[in-house]
């Protein structure tokens, strides 16, 4: 899967930023003020060492934050559990789909 740089949700442009690491050391976050999904490429361990995230972790984080954008634009409350579930569903779909052209 290729992580998009930009796309639209509910007519609003959303930007995706891949960063070395987030300020709060999360895997990523949805910024509803700036319509931005921020995804970390690395996580800082307790000893301060940076550990790279796998492609699978980055994809899962993208889907998780995308669902937060869906929740925001549909007027629903944010739910970490719901976002985790749908991110895992989408990752499984993405990894197992067979394409017909």
Language-model segment annotations:
Residues 77-101:
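C-terminal charged interaction modules
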